[in-house]
């Protein structure tokens, strides 16, 4: 279980990734609602996502931002990129994320780009494998980011020094 990150202490920026129009057919006709997917982050290693549903788009976005601020995770960053390669899987969505050389930029599409930019990762290469549904792609990206470990964490888990890992 990851530790709680207080969103009040961070300068958080949000980005709407997707808005879906959802209809429910009832006896009297169709009921229209909107579902919003929002990613929030401080561009300094903290990122979260949330979904919200409401009858109006602004209200759905507000609910999604509220949920996203409660689901912040910390992402290990080495320089301007990821510490190592990772694959995130959620449902049918799979994301392959690879560290890139400084100056490469964010080579990622749509939902993954939003997550990477708001997490503060400036150089990364990613490939979406499987489902391209925005919600599954974002969840898979988060699963991949949660699996990331920096050298200090790996050394501590193995009970060796960081210098020993470098050999």
Curated annotation (Swiss-Prot):
<dbReference type="GO" id="GO:0019843">
    <property type="term" value="F:rRNA binding"/>
</dbReference>
<dbReference type="Pfam" id="PF03719">
    <property type="entry name" value="Ribosomal_S5_C"/>
</dbReference>
<dbReference type="InterPro" id="IPR013810">
    <property type="entry name" value="Ribosomal_uS5_N"/>
</dbReference>
<dbReference type="InterPro" id="IPR020568">
    <property type="entry name" value="Ribosomal_Su5_D2-typ_SF"/>
</dbReference>
<dbReference type="InterPro" id="IPR018192">
    <property type="entry name" value="Ribosomal_uS5_N_CS"/>
</dbReference>
<dbReference type="GO" id="GO:0003735">
    <property type="term" value="F:structural constituent of ribosome"/>
</dbReference>
<comment type="function">
    <text>With S4 and S12 plays an important role in translational accuracy.</text>
</comment>
<keyword id="KW-0699">rRNA-binding</keyword>
<keyword id="KW-0694">RNA-binding</keyword>
<dbReference type="InterPro" id="IPR005712">
    <property type="entry name" value="Ribosomal_uS5_bac-type"/>
</dbReference>
<keyword id="KW-0689">Ribosomal protein</keyword>
<dbReference type="InterPro" id="IPR005324">
    <property type="entry name" value="Ribosomal_uS5_C"/>
</dbReference>
<feature type="domain" description="S5 DRBM">
    <location>
        <begin position="12"/>
        <end position="75"/>
    </location>
</feature>
<keyword id="KW-0687">Ribonucleoprotein</keyword>
<comment type="function">
    <text>Located at the back of the 30S subunit body where it stabilizes the conformation of the head with respect to the body.</text>
</comment>
<comment type="similarity">
    <text>Belongs to the universal ribosomal protein uS5 family.</text>
</comment>
<comment type="subunit">
    <text>Part of the 30S ribosomal subunit. Contacts proteins S4 and S8.</text>
</comment>
<protein>
    <recommendedName>
        <fullName>Small ribosomal subunit protein uS5</fullName>
    </recommendedName>
</protein>
<dbReference type="InterPro" id="IPR000851">
    <property type="entry name" value="Ribosomal_uS5"/>
</dbReference>
<dbReference type="GO" id="GO:0006412">
    <property type="term" value="P:translation"/>
</dbReference>
<dbReference type="InterPro" id="IPR014721">
    <property type="entry name" value="Ribsml_uS5_D2-typ_fold_subgr"/>
</dbReference>
<dbReference type="Pfam" id="PF00333">
    <property type="entry name" value="Ribosomal_S5"/>
</dbReference>
<dbReference type="GO" id="GO:0015935">
    <property type="term" value="C:small ribosomal subunit"/>
</dbReference>
């Amino acid at each position: 279980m990851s530790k709680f990150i207080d969103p009040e202490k961070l300068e958080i920026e949000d980005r709407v990734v997707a808005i879906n129009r959802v209809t429910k057919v009832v006896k009297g006709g169709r009921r229209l609602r909107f579902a919003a997917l929002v990613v929030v982050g401080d561009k300094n290693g903290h990122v979260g996502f949330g979904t919200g549903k409401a009858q109006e788009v602004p209200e759905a976005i507000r609910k999604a931002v509220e949920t996203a601020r409660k689901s912040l995770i910390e992402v290990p960053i080495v320089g301007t990129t990821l510490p190592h390669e990772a694959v995130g899987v959620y449902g049918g969505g799979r994301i392959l994320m690879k560290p890139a050389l400084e100056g490469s930029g964010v080579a990622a599409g749509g939902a993954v780009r939003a997550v990477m930019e708001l997490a503060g990762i400036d150089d990364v290469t990613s490939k979406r494998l499987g489902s391209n549904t925005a919600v599954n792609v974002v969840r898979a990206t988060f699963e991949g980011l949660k699996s990331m470990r920096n050298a200090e964490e790996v050394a501590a888990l193995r009970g060796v020094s960081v210098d020993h890992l470098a050999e």
